[in-house]
């Protein structure tokens, strides 16, 4: 367990801040997150946080523990994001409306220089999160939309630009080229553009990874021009447009639409009936593309930022 930087004890709970979780604490966080997801219909911790629970050396962890030893609240702080520190927090559904979310948020705010614009995610955009943000003088900053569509019925045939062919990702062969293309395609994206080989390999190691659903588009010389990485969620089963990117030099030729359709057809052929994706509300071009392909708004995740 990492060193305890702060401890505030009240009559019923203890808030601890540390730089590392042991395996038992990681299991408690995952159990807490699962309970919240079942109640809220939205995962409170994104994939990169779940992966980083055991490995993120620079992360800070705030845990809220009852006298019984049950973890009833958790917050994750990543101080390394180039756009500024970013955090997540979750309180167990049976322990809400008791001020625990406020205590975790106060701990997060106290862990970051007041001059730095800390951002905190609210997954599902619930009114209670908006009220908590207002109480702590945080303003609405970024909106990440979740869009969904049914996969029933025929999907249009993808039409690739002349000379472009599509194939599946080959682990160990395409890694470096994909990382370079991803960085170029998402140069202005606050999270995706930061991925390197460690982030790619961490996801290749996940049980859900399937190279057959990781589609690459390349020119006649074998240079990667775009990709559509799909992911299949279980319980309930839904296919995701996990990451879709196109080389900026290849924009305007319909490659993004073709890759999207190819991935959706792959998911439909795998027997899935629904598809989902995440897109920034401010990315109007992408929102238009997905809307034209039949996607509709399902939910939203929001960041709140310190003024």
Where are these regions (language model features)?
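Acyl-donor-binding surface of acyltransferase catalytic domains
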Residues: 1-11, 79-86, 92-164, 304
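Short amphipathic alpha-helix that is part of the acyltransferase structural core
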Residues: 2-52, 65, 159-193
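Conserved donor-binding loop and adjoining core beta-sheet/short helix segment
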Residues: 18-23, 33-112, 119-124, 224-238
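Glycine-rich acetyl-CoA-binding "A-motif" of GNAT/NAT acetyltransferases
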Residues: 68-73, 141, 221-226, 285, ...
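Hydrophobic adenine-recognition pocket in adenosine-nucleotide-binding enzymes
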Residues: 91, 244-246, 279
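Conserved acetyl-CoA-binding loop-helix of GNAT-fold acetyltransferases
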Residues: 97-111, 243-248, 252-269, 287-292
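Active-site/acyl-donor-binding loops of N-acyltransferases
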Residues: 136-155, 261-307
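Phosphate-binding active sites in nucleotide-utilizing proteins
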Residues: 186-220, 224-235, 248
